């Protein structure tokens, strides 16, 4: 099962993430948990989230990039749900062997995130990748949709289909 942990602070303003979710919903075996809808007060149901994670083979963290990082509720979710004794530490093997995909949208162009004056995705993903590895998750190459503020509908739709294809290819490779 693919579990998408969706963290968009302003989902009603979303153009790119909305299309990505629409495409993902067309696949079988996909569950979407919209954190800002489930937890507007930031009071996370840890047991429910851990139960959802236990059913997943692929975990996707999908969100818009904010100040070169993840939205605050996703950070809190990781802090609370990936608990000692469950996700890491003595007896913390619940996530071992599962896969993690970072699916992020950005307002800037792809060249904006190449090494130079701004850090590239290899640098930006390091804290997330380190978290994944520490918890026994298999880190997958990130999926990024760039220029989301200036893309036309056709481009956004094409990128969303590419996202769906990426998820489908993972399903086919791991579940035949």
Curated annotation (Swiss-Prot):
The keyword Flavoprotein applies. GO terms for cellular component: plasma membrane. GO terms for biological process: positive regulation of potassium ion transmembrane transport; potassium ion transport. One of its GO terms (molecular function) is NADH:ubiquinone reductase (non-electrogenic) activity. Its main location: membrane. It is a peripheral membrane protein. Keywords: Cell inner membrane, Cell membrane, Flavoprotein, FMN, Membrane, NAD, Oxidoreductase. Pfam families: Flavodoxin_2. Its EC number is 1.6.5.2. The keyword DNA repair does not apply. It is found in: Cell inner membrane. It catalyses: a quinone + NADH + H(+) = a quinol + NAD(+); a quinone + NADPH + H(+) = a quinol + NADP(+). FMN binds at residues 8, 14-17, 65-68, 105-108. It is an enzyme of class 1 (oxidoreductase). Its cofactor is FMN. Regulatory subunit of a potassium efflux system that confers protection against electrophiles. Required for full activity of KefC. Shows redox enzymatic activity, but this enzymatic activity is not required for activation of KefC. Belongs to the NAD(P)H dehydrogenase (quinone) family. KefF subfamily. NCBIfam families: PRK00871.1 (NF002044). Homodimer. Interacts with KefC. This is Glutathione-regulated potassium-efflux system ancillary protein KefF. The lineage of its organism: Bacteria, Pseudomonadati, Pseudomonadota, Gammaproteobacteria, Enterobacterales. The gene is kefF.
